Amino acid sequence: MMKSSELEKKKVLVLGTAKSGIAAATYLVKAGAVVTVNDGGTPSENDVQTLESLKVETLFGSHPLSLLDGTDLIVKNPGIPYQIPLLQKALELGIPVWTEVELAYRSTKADWVAITGSNGKTTTTTLVHELLKRGSKRVHLAGNIGFPAVEVAQQAEAGDVIVIELSSFQLMGIESFCPVSAAFLNLSPAHLDYHGDVTSYAAAKARIFSNMDEAGRLVVNADDEEVMRLSETAAAERLTFSRRQDAYAHIENDMIFVGQTEILPVRELALGGGHNLENVLAALTLIEPFGISLTAIQDVLRTFGGVAHRTEYIGEFAGRKVYNDSKATNNVATEAALSGFQSPIIWICGGLERGADLTPLKSAMTHVKHVIGLGETGQRFADLATEQQIASTVTREMEEAVATAFDVSKPGDIILLSPASASWDQYKTYEERGEHFIRSVQKVGGMMK
C-alpha cells in the first residue's frame, strides 16, 4: 500500500476527466499532490465545477507536450490511446503512466477480486459481488459497473474485498496491481483500433495475473486455447472451468460441480444461456476460497437473472418477444445471443466501424429472419445478410430500426438488439444505446395491437 505522504508535493498529470479522472484528481488533491487535469475535449459542466472546487490547474482542448515539464506521474483515462504524442513522449522520458486502478490498488489494504475477458465480464463481476455479499466480509463493487476504483478504495478497509471488472484499457496502465483471485474468461479480437493488433490486445488482458504469486488463484476457461496458452506463464494457482469438458468447475449429468462439490442442477439457474453458464462456473471458482455457504450460493444462483443490456428481456409487444443486448460490442457476444434462440429472429445490429471481420457471425445466423443494419457498420451487416440469402434493411437511427423490426416481424418472432459493434458512432455508452432501444420499443410496440 502506498502512503498518502508518498504523493505529497508530487506533480501529477490527470489525463481525461469523466468519472475516473475526477475521482483520481479528488484523491490526489487530498493526498497533497500538485495536480493538473488535462482533457483533449470539453468536459461536462459538472466536471468543470468539481475541478474548480478542487482548485487544480486545468487545460482543455489539446494535449501540449509542455504539460510534461516536471511531471512525476500521469494517471490517464483508460480510453485515451497510448499513441497520442503526449503519452509517447512521457513513456520516452520514463514518466510512469497509470490508470486509476493502479492508484486505487496502492491506496488501500483491501483484497481485490478481478475479472477480465472479451465477453461475460459484467455478468461474472456482478454475480461474484452478489455471492460474496452473502459471506462475512464487507464487499465493494468497483469499476465500469460500480463507482470509480479509487473512490471505492477510500471506503474499503483491511479485510474488505473489492470486486472489479477490468478492461484491456485499464490493465495497460497497471504496475503493481495484484488481485488475490482473478478470472480470465475468454479472448476474441476486440479494440484493435486501440491496441493495434490481437497480440497486443491479448498481452494487455494477460496483465491481470502478471503480479500474482502462488498464493493467488487464477481462474481460466479450459475451452479457450489462447487463454490457456497465455496463462501457462502464471505463477498463481491456475484452476479451469468448462461446460464442455472435464475441469475444476464443470457440468456432470446436468449438475454444476466445483472441485468435488455439487452445487446446483443447471436447470435451477435463473441465468439462462450457455455463455452465462460459463460465467457461473467462473464466478463459483473465484469465490470458493471465501467460504460462502452452499445454501447461500444456491439461493443467489436461483434468483440472479443477469444484468441490464446483456440479453435483457424487455417484454412481449404485439406477440413479439424483445431482447436488449446492447452490451454485445463484438462478434463473440452477439454469436452467443443469436445462438440462444430457436424462434425466428429480427436482428438489429451495427454501430462504430472498427474493421472487424464479420464472417464468424454466419454460423450463428441460422434462425435470423431479417437483418436491420444501424450506424457506421449497418451496410456491412446488410451485405452479410445478403451473402446468407437473408432479407435486410439499412436504417439511420434506432427508432427507425425498431419500427422496421415490428413491420417485418410477426407474432412469435424475436426482436433482438445485439449490435456486435461499439456504440460510440451515435451514443456515448452502450447503456445509452440500450435505453434508447427500450424507449423506442415501448413507443412503437405500445401502439401496436
Swiss-Prot record:
Compartment annotation: Cytoplasm
KW Acyltransferase (keyword) present: no
UniProt keywords, alphabetically: ATP-binding, Cell cycle, Cell division, Cell shape, Cell wall biogenesis/degradation, Cytoplasm, Ligase, Nucleotide-binding, Peptidoglycan synthesis
Ligand binding (ATP): 117-123
Record Pfam families: Mur_ligase_C (PF02875), Mur_ligase_M (PF08245), MurD-like_N (PF21799)
Catalytic activity: UDP-N-acetyl-alpha-D-muramoyl-L-alanine + D-glutamate + ATP = UDP-N-acetyl-alpha-D-muramoyl-L-alanyl-D-glutamate + ADP + phosphate + H(+)
Known EC number: 6.3.2.9
Molecular function terms, GO-annotated: ATP binding; UDP-N-acetylmuramoylalanine-D-glutamate ligase activity
GO cellular component: cytoplasm
Any GO BP annotation: cell wall organization
Pathway participation: Cell wall biogenesis; peptidoglycan biosynthesis
Main location: cytoplasm
HAMAP family the record matches: MurD (MF_00639)
Function: Cell wall formation. Catalyzes the addition of glutamate to the nucleotide precursor UDP-N-acetylmuramoyl-L-alanine (UMA).
Family (UniProt): Belongs to the MurCDEF family.
Protein name as annotated: UDP-N-acetylmuramoylalanine--D-glutamate ligase
Species this chain originates from: Exiguobacterium sibiricum (strain DSM 17290 / CCUG 55495 / CIP 109462 / JCM 13490 / 255-15)
